[in-house]
Amino acid sequence: MSDLDRQIGQLKRCEPLSESEVKALCLKAMEILVEESNVQRVDAPVTLCGDIHGQFYDMMELFKVGGDCPKTNYLFMGDFVDRGYYSVETFLLLLALKVRYPDRITLIRGNHESRQITQVYGFYDECLRKYGSSNVWRYCTDIFDYMSLSAVVENKIFCVHGGLSPAIMTLDQIRTIDRKQEVPHDGAMCDLLWSDPEDIVDGWGLSPRGAGFLFGGSVVTSFNHSNNIDYIARAHQLVMEGYKWMFDSQIVTVWSAPNYCYRCGNVASILELDENLNKEFRVFDAAQQDSRGPPAKKPAPDYFL
């Protein structure tokens, strides 16, 4: 059994790797990711997944429902880390699968794959707690800079974490972005990771998130038409039912973190596409283990007995 297969087995038991193993894994991943396009081409059949947010046991549930990688070809649309209790194990497992089966799993960047955001929403603190230094956080956030910004399935389905940008009319314009950097505060790259579709907006609107834009149905129609795509698949927004179509099925939100933050009570979904791009949503609930909330603390030693 190779080192990598052993590490994958270990991560599937939610046991983190050593710091030196993380460093080596990230270096291997970098070599693979640097070759990918800003608009990564993906073949069907493929299963599309939305936000995971460090909910490791729920991701294990996702693999139970959707099948193991590499048997199933997966596309994860970002936000692997933050908010959940197991961002380290979640991200490292996905990264190890990417290194082991590069053609069977595609990882695109979400707005939480950023140094600034992870210092606020949990991943940085988790790395510090589990490793005693920020080195692992640094190795992982360096990898974030290499991740693709979007993907296109069979030239027909455009997949992105957040949404569209007023600076982007065509997929070719996305291809020209220099992605190997921290997510900027504004501009095309920021918008792709931060924007949201909104019913009550026609055209473009200001986003309450403070980054990206709100965009309406007419924007989606013209983007899809210009790029000859059938619809957009994206994540980024909690959907209580696990998925949600908008604008006459021109865009779909897929959300893959059930009982988000261990308290929202939502279901999650993944979108399975067969070789002819026929769609099947698989809806699933939180894993039993994870519905209990935070990981059990090891009992404190009984010094006083």
Curated annotation (Swiss-Prot):
Record-linked InterPro entries: Calcineurin-like_PHP_ApaH, Metallo-depent_PP-like, PPA2-like, Ser/Thr-sp_prot-phosphatase
Binding annotation for Mn(2+) 1? D51, H53, D79
Identify which cofactors the protein needs according to its UniProt entry. Mn(2+)
At the top of the EC hierarchy, this enzyme's class is: hydrolase
Q: Keywords for this entry?
A: Hydrolase, Manganese, Metal-binding, Plastid, Protein phosphatase
The domain of life is: Eukaryota
For this record, the Gene Ontology CC terms, alphabetical, are: cytoplasm; cytosol; nucleus; plastid stroma
Question: Which compartments is it annotated to reside in?
Answer: Plastid stroma
| Matches recorded under SUPFAM superfamilies | Metallo-dependent phosphatases
Enzyme Commission code(s) on record? 3.1.3.16
What is the reported tissue distribution? Answer: Ubiquitous, mostly expressed in root mersitems, flowers, and vascular tissues.
Provide the active-site residues from the annotation: H112
State a single Pfam family of this protein: Metallophos
Q: Which reaction does this enzyme catalyse, per its entry? A: O-phospho-L-seryl-[protein] + H2O = L-seryl-[protein] + phosphate; O-phospho-L-threonyl-[protein] + H2O = L-threonyl-[protein] + phosphate
Q: Does the keyword Manganese apply?
A: yes
Q: Which GO terms describe its biological process?
A: reciprocal meiotic recombination
Recorded GO molecular functions are:
metal ion binding; protein serine/threonine phosphatase activity
Q: Which family does it belong to?
A: Belongs to the PPP phosphatase family. PP-4 (PP-X) subfamily.
According to the record's subunit comment, the protein's assembly and interactions are: Interacts with TAP46.
Q: Know the name of this protein? A: Serine/threonine-protein phosphatase PP-X isozyme 1
